[in-house]
Amino acid sequence: MIFLGPVLLTRGALSFFLTAGGSSVYRAWSWWLSGIHLFMAFSMSTSSLYKVGFGFVCTKSPCLRVSLISRSQPWRFYSVHNNFEAPDVVQLAAKARISLTPKEVEDYGPKIGQVIDWFGQLQGVNLENVEPAIRADTDKLSNLRPDEPIIYEDREEMIAGVPTLEEPFIKVPKILKSSME
C-alpha cells in the first residue's frame, strides 16, 4: 500500500510523481479549493496507461476518500462522506484575486458544488473495455505546424505601449506577496 500525506500549495496545481517499484510510475495532480482537495491520478507502466482515478478529500467536514493501489488489481476507492457545506465563494474569489458581486457569489456556490459532484460521477464510469491510451487524439499530432520562432516586425510599436521597460525585458507588477517569495 502507498500512503501519501497531504501537501499544501498556496496557489495553482501540484503535480507529483511516485514510483512504487518495478516499472510503474504514478502521477497525480491535485488542487486545493477552500478546504476541498481535488485530485486526478493515473498509473503508467512502460507499455501503456494502466488506470485513471479522480477523487476529492474534504478537510472541513467528515468526508474521507482513500485509494488503494495494487499492481495486479484495479484501483479500489473506499469512501465515507457526509453532506458538506458549500465552499466559501468569497474566500475562493479572494484567493484568486477576483471581485464578485453578491449575486455572483450566490450563483457560483451551487456551481462549484456541481463540479465536485461531477468528480464523484466519474468514479462510476466503467472503463474495463476501453483501450489504454495516453492521448485521445493521436492522429492530430501529425498535423501540427513546425515549432519555429517568428520575429515580430513591429517591435518598436509594441514596446511603445509598454508602461515599464527594463531592456530587454518588460517589467510587470508583482503577483505574490513579499512573505511568499
UniProtKB/Swiss-Prot annotation:
GO cellular component entries: chloroplast; glutamyl-tRNA(Gln) amidotransferase complex; mitochondrion
Enzyme class: ligase
Biological process terms in GO annotation: glutaminyl-tRNAGln biosynthesis via transamidation; mitochondrial translation; regulation of translational fidelity
Gene3D superfamilies referenced in this protein's UniProt entry, alphabetically: Glu-tRNAGln amidotransferase C subunit, N-terminal domain
Domain of life: Eukaryota
4Fe-4S recorded as keyword: no
Entry keywords, A to Z: ATP-binding, Chloroplast, Ligase, Mitochondrion, Nucleotide-binding, Plastid, Protein biosynthesis
Reactions catalysed according to its record: L-glutamyl-tRNA(Gln) + L-glutamine + ATP + H2O = L-glutaminyl-tRNA(Gln) + L-glutamate + ADP + phosphate + H(+)
Single GO molecular function: glutaminyl-tRNA synthase (glutamine-hydrolyzing) activity
SUPFAM superfamilies documented for this protein: Glu-tRNAGln amidotransferase C subunit (SSF141000)
Pfam families reported in the protein's UniProt record: GatC (PF02686)
Subcellular location: Mitochondrion; Plastid, Chloroplast
InterPro entries: Asp/Glu-ADT_sf_sub_c, GatC
Keyword Endoplasmic reticulum attached: no
Coiled-coil region(s): none
Broad class of the protein's primary localization: mitochondrion
EC number: 6.3.5.-
PANTHER family the UniProt entry points to: GLUTAMYL-TRNA(GLN) AMIDOTRANSFERASE SUBUNIT C, MITOCHONDRIAL (PTHR15004:SF0)
Family of this protein: Belongs to the GatC family.
Note: This protein may be expected to contain an N-terminal transit peptide but none has been predicted.
Assembly and oligomerization: Subunit of the heterotrimeric GatCAB amidotransferase (AdT) complex, composed of A, B and C subunits.
Protein task: Allows the formation of correctly charged Gln-tRNA(Gln) through the transamidation of misacylated Glu-tRNA(Gln) in chloroplasts and mitochondria. The reaction takes place in the presence of glutamine and ATP through an activated gamma-phospho-Glu-tRNA(Gln).
Name of the molecule in the record: Glutamyl-tRNA(Gln) amidotransferase subunit C, chloroplastic/mitochondrial
